């Protein structure tokens, strides 16, 4: 099983790549963490936000592996505690399907794309900058794995 984060945006600061790589390399191969960056639609084209999100959605769809469980990160998504995320991770691993987390661009994710997802979650009630979302998501996925592995990283 892979945990795949498909995120609109590229050219992240070096600290984001460093943090991402650190958490990704900590996870075992049977729970690998992978990032797929999607080129954002240029914001200078005169297109509406809906048109830009639709264009990004087409790129996102092309990056999603067949048969994967799809979860959209959205401000109106379901809150999960760290323990609940670890329980979900356990279920996902038992199911064997890849799990894809979709992170939208500056305008979010296209409504049709969100509707096609198996669920929607949010990382926080606070608004987080996109670079921080990647780091927080990677850390929480690692923490969820650490809980299941009884690793001392998470001390409840």
From Swiss-Prot:
Q: Which interval of the chain is the signal sequence?
A: none
Q: What is its main location?
A: cytoplasm
**Binding, S-adenosyl-L-methionine:** 73, 104, 123-128
GO MF annotations in UniProt: rRNA (pseudouridine-N3-)-methyltransferase activity
EC code: 2.1.1.177
**Which reactions does this protein catalyse?**
pseudouridine(1915) in 23S rRNA + S-adenosyl-L-methionine = N(3)-methylpseudouridine(1915) in 23S rRNA + S-adenosyl-L-homocysteine + H(+)
Compartmental location: Cytoplasm
**Keywords, ordered alphabetically:** Cytoplasm, Methyltransferase, rRNA processing, S-adenosyl-L-methionine, Transferase
A Gene Ontology cellular-component term: cytoplasm
- SUPFAM superfamilies in UniProt: alpha/beta knot (SSF75217)
InterPro entries under this entry?
A: Alpha/beta_knot_MTases, RlmH-like, tRNA_m1G_MTases_N
Query: Which cysteines are disulphide-bonded?
Result: none
The answer to whether UniProt assigns keyword Cytoplasm to this entry is yes
Q: Which residues form a coiled coil?
A: none
Q: Does the keyword Cytoplasm apply?
A: yes
* Task performed by this protein: Specifically methylates the pseudouridine at position 1915 (m3Psi1915) in 23S rRNA.
Q: Which NCBIfam families match?
A: PRK00103.1-4 (NF000986)
Family to which the UniProt record says this protein belongs = Belongs to the RNA methyltransferase RlmH family.
State the name under which the record lists this protein: Ribosomal RNA large subunit methyltransferase H
Source organism (scientific name): Bordetella petrii (strain ATCC BAA-461 / DSM 12804 / CCUG 43448)
């Amino acid at each position: 099983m892979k945990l795949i984060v498909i995120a609109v945006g590229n050219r992240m600061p070096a600290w984001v790549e460093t943090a991402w790589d650190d958490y990704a390399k900590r996870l075992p191969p049977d729970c690998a963490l992978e990032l797929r960056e999607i080129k954002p639609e240029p914001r200078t084209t005169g297109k509406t936000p809906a048109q830009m999100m639709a264009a990004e959605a087409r790129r996102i769809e092309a990056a999603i592996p067949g048969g994967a469980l799809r979860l959209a990160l959205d401000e109106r998504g379901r809150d999960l505690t760290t323990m609940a995320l670890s329980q979900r991770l356990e279920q996902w691993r038992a199911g064997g399907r890849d799990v894809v987390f979709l992170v939208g661009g500056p305008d979010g994710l296209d409504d049709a794309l969100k509707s096609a997802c198996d669920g929607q979650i949010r990382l926080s009630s606070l608004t987080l900058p996109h670079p921080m979302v990647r780091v927080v998501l990677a850390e929480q996925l690692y923490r969820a794995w650490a809980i299941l592995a009884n690793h001392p990283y998470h001390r409840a």
